[in-house]
Curated annotation (Swiss-Prot):
Protein name, entry field: Glucose transporter 1E
Listed transmembrane segments: 44-64, 119-139, 152-172, 176-196, 214-234, 251-271, 302-322, 339-359, 368-388, 404-424, 439-459, 476-496
PANTHER family: FACILITATED GLUCOSE TRANSPORTER PROTEIN 1, SOLUTE CARRIER FAMILY 2
Membrane topology value: Multi-pass membrane protein
Database matches in NCBIfam families: SP
InterPro entries, sorted: GLUT, MFS_dom, MFS_sugar_transport-like, MFS_trans_sf, Sugar/inositol_transpt
Main location as per UniProt: membrane
Species, as recorded: Trypanosoma brucei brucei
Extracellular compartment spans: 65-118, 173-175, 235-250, 323-338, 389-403, 460-475
Amino acid sequence: MTERRDNVSHAPDAIEGPNDGAHAEETSPGFFSFENLGVAQVQVVGGTLNGYVIGYVAVYLLLYLTATECKFTTEGACGGRKIYGCKWSGTTCKFENPKCSEGSDPSDSCKNEVAYTSVYSGIFACAMIVGSMVGSIIAGKCITTFGLKKSFIIVSITCTIACVVVQVAIEYNNYYALCTGRVLIGLGVGILCSVFPMYVNENAHPKLCKMDGVLFQVFTTLGIMLAAMLGLILDKTGASKEEANMAGRLHVFSAVPLGLSVAMFLVGMFLRESTATFAQDDDGKADGGMDPNEYGWGQMLWPLFMGAVTAGTLQLTGINAVMNYAPKITENLGMDPSLGNFLVMAWNFVTSLVAIPLASRFTMRQMFITCSFVASCMCLFLCGIPVFPGVAEEKVKNGVATTGIALFIAAFEFGVGSCFFVLAQDLFPPSFRPKGSSFVVMMQFIFNILINLLYPITTEAISGGATGDQDKGQAVVFILFGLIGLICFVLQFFYLYPYDANQDHENDHGTEPVERILSPVDVPTPRN
């Protein structure tokens, strides 16, 4: 058997002895101590950046719609934005395409000049996710090759370059450059989603590890809310939209992730080295630290499968459909798009805060499974069936659907989103976590791509086109979200368990790692 690190038994998911828990309780740092904040700071900056780039899509599409409507009332606002197909003619702002200016041509060629088509919107929404999927694939190799701290710096540099590309794309209204920038920032985010939770998992005190772990999702929701709040400010305040420089507002909105990327680089430069190290010699064997080749992919098939199921719960229950298309969804429910988007994201953040005290009282498994069941039921019985045309009256439908979305988001943030990145680590033994967590994160990005690309197209198609009743398509899609969530819930109820680090010694007597995992116990928390 390959030699293991001596301190593996002290990993955050290890089961403590009868006296270890009391000792840890007495000697552990406080949640707001400098020692703990020095570890948790990576969740703050990384989660906020992750959330902002997620919330970026809905706001950008809304601001871009305003920029391309050519309803500006001043020559400066209209004439200065020829890149959006607008020109000043006498006293009015018109489309450069004469057919559009006449207002009598209903052809698609004219309509497509306003905002993006559903296909272009879907591609734009999933561009970052494609990059994230690639980033998650290489994250494991990046961690074992460069270590956690250097990977942190690599992420910050990649995201900074991506933000510069986006700024250039906005200046020239280049859709393809914009998508390229989103792919690049997704590449950084894909690595980030494995590196940052792993750094906390390996370096936080055992008592605080799970509470620190859920901070990644908490600050992800904060980043999403910040994007929605800034979008509301840019859309509603200052000069009216008819007189404003919308391209300038898009530049301001896109400058925030650039600032966060630079801040991430500065944090990474002064971040202390991780206690977990991975090293290999030329023969692929460990020459120090943990051996990343200790477990093969075949030995981890069952944990990998359950990781994919948790990723399905995270993405295929529709959370990103709500996040990316919140303005359109809330508008269909009779609300102002930008205000509705902000209210959804603010509620998303507030509910995520509840996960911190819950993590000190319940296991990650208990939180994840319970909340996944509730979220799936909300999709099916409140967001889906009542919204279908003819099932309920308009006022009742809007009230029930709004309540359903609110409860769905609450259940998701209480346990599904907050526990996912912790479970992506806990499902695997420490030496396999670079590979295992990268795979799980990759799967959630694959599912994310499917949702972002197919949600607008499927909703529109089921509704009978852009002019059809959009409630029909939205209802059918949310019913599917609920059914998928319930299927995943059944699998998780019977088979989702964290890796049992306390049974490592069984391998010395011939028991294979996969056999150890089939009957594990839950990871304990300070109060459970």
